[in-house]
Amino acid sequence: MSILGTYLETAMTDPIIPTSQLVTTTPLSQNPAVVYLARLTSALSKRTMRAALDKIAALDGQDAFTLHWAALRYQHTLAIRARLAADYAPATANKLLSALRGVLKEAWRLGQMSAEDYQRAVDLENIKAETLPAGRDLSFGEIKALADVCMNDPSPAGVRDAAIIGVLATCGVRRAELASLRVEHFETDSGKIVIRGGKGNKDRTVYATHGALDALLDWLVLRGTHLGALFVPINKGGSVQHERGMSAQAVYKMLVKRGLEAGVKEFSAHDFRRTFVGDLLDRGVDIATVAKLAGHSDVKTTARYDRRPETTKCDAAGKLHFPYHRRSSW
């Protein structure tokens, strides 16, 4: 019996549709999963939600395109929610639930579900939990150490990597967004960088200033200002390769390499983003502006990176004293 079937057997006494009927023979043109993914505007969203649907379908031994989504009823989706809550962090589980709701909506639009069955099936609360954002903050000293190893590298890679780290640290861009930047997205006079097709297929503007702008301008001297990918590979001989841009994976590998050289403990590209948001909020920038710079559609997401409540709690704890002093000797 499938995992979903086991959940239904233990959680539901009279399922409307046995899981053996959850396999579809619907043509792809009428498959709600195919239609749902086709409606998504960015390639990243398509990949993310395809993976989400595959995870849900795997509960019944299917994939996104073989599960009979239109046959799901409330007892099925409730069992799915229970399994997701048990297996995934709340944010991940809720993303999977969002994909589930989306594909069921397409099943209703295609006339494969009645309005009543659809409304009941998607009547699921998100999984609630108060969790800290993943990752860690990078200190100014750590960022400086990363910049220093790049500046001490006389090769073209040193110049390029300093520019990449500068953009990550001061613009809060996502790794995939950085990899997709093009020269025509960057204004050398103002430092303005236009992020095209970010998460949710949203465009936004960020600004490289001070040292980050200087690093970018130095990189353009080596790279040249002709159109194309802003950050490109450099071969072992030190030659700049203009044929293609750096991949997000190449950016990741570069950061690992520079982190080891700088003696900085393990970090990710997203930790620059986390630090960027937290630092701006610490400096009193209003949360709506920070959300726009970070590309957050909801300021609640931005608020999760706000370190000030922790500072307030730490200050409050400091008002309590325990009458003990370190011993001078043992």
Give residue spans per PLM region:
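Conserved catalytic core of the tyrosine transesterase superfamily
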Residues: 2-330
